[in-house]
Amino acid sequence: MPIRALCTICSDFFDHSRDVAAIHCGHTFHLQCLIQWFETAPSRTCPQCRIQVGKKTIINKLFFDLAQEEENVLDAEFLKNELDSVKAQLSQKDREKRDSQAIIDTLRDTLEERNATVESLQNALNKAEMLCSTLKKQMKFLEQRQDETKQAREEAHRLKCKMKTMEQIELLLQSQRSEVEEMIRDMGVGQSAVEQLAVYCVSLKKEYENLKEARKATGELADRLKKDLVSSRSKLKTLNTELDQAKLELRSAQKDLQSADQEITSLRKKLMILQGTLSLPPATNETVSRLVFESPAPVEMMNPRLHQPPFGDEIDLNTTFDVNTPPTQTSGSQHCLPKKLCLERARSPMQNVLKKVHKVSKPESQLSLGGQRCVGELDEELAGAFPLFIRNAVLGQKQPNRTTAESRCSTDVVRIGFDGLGGRTKFIQPRDTTIIRPVPVKSKAKSKQKVRIKTVSSASQPKLDTFLCQ
């Protein structure tokens, strides 16, 4: 078994790979560890017992005799020493690695700082270049402005000289002879004075020509204004004449308007009288029937006949048409239809008369001032609008007085009665029954006459078969 001794300095077991040294006190250490101890310690003492040690008292190397069979056997202490040395190396490597990693991190930080510095310097360089280009442009602009300023100064100096010359010319034009002579004397003698005098002479000549032209233009303007004044006076005279004529026309128009108002008033009164005259007063159906049958047949009720086509086209007689046959009617309705048509035709002139009466009663602004119509023309027009039986029965009577007609119109009564054609109608019944004189006929004779007239009228009316035969 090997000696299980260890070095108290490095705590490693003794082996044959390193030398073992001893001190005179008897303690043993690794030679390398003992030398390093003496170099680092403040005094040369034993690391274990602290006794003073001299250089001569140190045994540098001890020799141990080992057995032959034990040389090839691995010792646990040796392996432990190797393991400790490997661990120490590993820890050293780890420490070196950590130091290297710290150095690498430091270098990386330094590199990033340098990159940031380079980037900032690059940005600063770009800004400096932009600033330099801007300054160059500004310098160029300032040089241009300087040139413009120089030109402006020259122009200002030239204009100042010109203004001074103009002031002198103005003074020359406005001043008296003595002042002009004094100014000429102040000019002195020389080429510049001669040039100045020449300029003054040219300016005076131009001013004289301008004054001549202005005088000529002023004379022409005065002549034109005189002519305009004469023409304006003549126009004013004409307008005054026209104004007087217009005033006269206005007065005549006012007189015409007053006469038209009087005419409208008279026409309204006559219209009221005519409305009272045209009222049908009888309360019996016999008078209406008599007036209807006494009237001649209207033009529209003539016998129908075939006419020439309007456009001259030929008619194809072979063409067939679907004609809807009306239902058969009773004899009473067939007899009453023509009379009803006759009554409707007879009523149409009455409607036209009412329309004409409404036209007469329009506002005064629609009447023409110059075109007046007399009363007789209106009466003739109204009389021509009525059918013959109305004129014979009503208009043929004597015109009653205006006061009686107005009193009669105010006492008339509107009634509803039979119209003699199977229907009802409204009529105005006057209180004075002497307007229409009914024919004195007995009641039985009236009924017989009515039946006979109905048969005659129905027989005289055209039929469909006679129309087709024609």
UniProtKB/Swiss-Prot annotation:
A motif (PIP-box) lies at residues 461-470. InterPro entries: TRAIP_ubiq-protein_ligase, Znf_RING, Znf_RING/FYVE/PHD. Pathway: Protein modification; protein ubiquitination. One of its GO terms (molecular function) is ubiquitin protein ligase activity. Autoubiquitinated. Sumoylated; sumoylation is required for nuclear localization. Sumoylation increases protein stability, possibly by preventing ubiquitination. Detected in testis and thymus, and at lower levels in spleen. Keywords: Chromosome, Coiled coil, Cytoplasm, DNA damage, DNA repair, Metal-binding, Nucleus, Repeat, Transferase, Ubl conjugation, Ubl conjugation pathway, Zinc, Zinc-finger. Pfam families: zf-RING_2. The keyword Ribosomal protein does not apply. Residues 76-277 form a coiled coil. Its main location: nucleus. Interacts (via PIP-box) with PCNA. Binds TRAF1, TRAF2, TRAF3, TRAF5 and TRAF6 is part of the receptor-TRAF signaling complex. May interact with CYLD; the C-terminus interacts with CYLD, however the interaction was not detected with the full-length protein. Interacts with POLK and POLN. Interacts with UIMC1. Belongs to the TRAIP family. E3 ubiquitin ligase required to protect genome stability in response to replication stress. Acts as a key regulator of interstrand cross-link repair, which takes place when both strands of duplex DNA are covalently tethered together, thereby blocking replication and transcription. During mitosis, controls the choice between the two pathways of replication-coupled interstrand-cross-link repair by mediating ubiquitination of MCM7 subunit of the CMG helicase complex. Short ubiquitin chains on MCM7 promote recruitment of DNA glycosylase NEIL3. This is E3 ubiquitin-protein ligase TRAIP.
